[in-house]
Amino acid sequence: MKTKTDFLKMKEQGEPITMLTAYDYPSAKLAEEAEVDMILVGDSLGMVVLGYDSTVPVTVEDMIHHTKAVRRGAKETFIVTDMPFMSYHVSPQDTMVNARRIVQESGAHALKVEGAGEVISTIHYLTSAGIPVVAHLGLTPQSVGVLGGYKVQGKDAESAKKLIEDAKRCEEAGAIALVLECVPMQLAKFISKQLTIPTIGIGAGQKVDGQVLVYHDLISYGVNRVPKFVKQYTSVQEEIVRGISQYVTEVKTGQFPEEKHSFTMKEEECLALYGGKQ
């Protein structure tokens, strides 16, 4: 299993880091078989798995439950778990309780937190206690209400400068990596060169140290639309609907199940049961 030391070496050597979300045993198992470097159990599970309109309703219990399943499916892959909405915007003591629960009960190797500001002290607090933390800047889904929706961040010089400073502060606070979401590629490139820790982009262009996508977006599974920055590599949704539709048709028309899908009794047992008559 790769560790944070390996990820630092990958950045130094210019080897791109691959990260993918996973929310359950089968998706994690497939991600590991495909040799993904790092798995993110994102609070995006609220939308793509639980059917919420945003990540806000996701709880600590949700994150623990799903991360445990992911760990069972990907025992040899570094796993990062999101701290959900408001689980780290509380007192330092309560933040530590939530963080400890996620790590101890789920088996996550690192936690991810969004934003800067007061979150910088949280990063320092958690890393000082021995909990690896991945920072997340740019578009931070837990704060879309404050940001005015799902919009690209850092498009003007002033906001870009703030993101640069925030990125440096995240590294200084002890973050082991930084996710940059929906920021101009020029800005992402500049930030990546300023930091010694890896940057993982999602909608941040090519010149970052790695990429992350949502599992369901990548394979077109249960999603009606995807953001501009997503490339869909296959469409399992079409195959799934086709298969289920065929099943429904065959049950309705009596084509399924066939005899080969059924179990039988020996003739003498049938005679003993009902005299051979049906």
UniProtKB/Swiss-Prot annotation:
Reactions the enzyme catalyzes: 3-methyl-2-oxobutanoate + (6R)-5,10-methylene-5,6,7,8-tetrahydrofolate + H2O = 2-dehydropantoate + (6S)-5,6,7,8-tetrahydrofolate
Gene3D superfamilies per UniProt: Phosphoenolpyruvate-binding domains
One example of the protein's molecular function in GO is: magnesium ion binding
For 3-methyl-2-oxobutanoate, which residues are the binding ones?
A: 43-44, 82, 112
Q: Which cofactor does it need?
A: Mg(2+)
Q: Which GO terms describe its biological process?
A: pantothenate biosynthetic process
Q: Which family is annotated?
A: Belongs to the PanB family.
Query: Any idea what job this protein has?
Result: Catalyzes the reversible reaction in which hydroxymethyl group from 5,10-methylenetetrahydrofolate is transferred onto alpha-ketoisovalerate to form ketopantoate.
Quaternary structure per UniProt?
Homodecamer; pentamer of dimers.
Q: What is this protein called?
A: 3-methyl-2-oxobutanoate hydroxymethyltransferase
Tell me the classification of the organism that encodes this protein: Bacteria, Bacillati, Bacillota, Bacilli, Bacillales
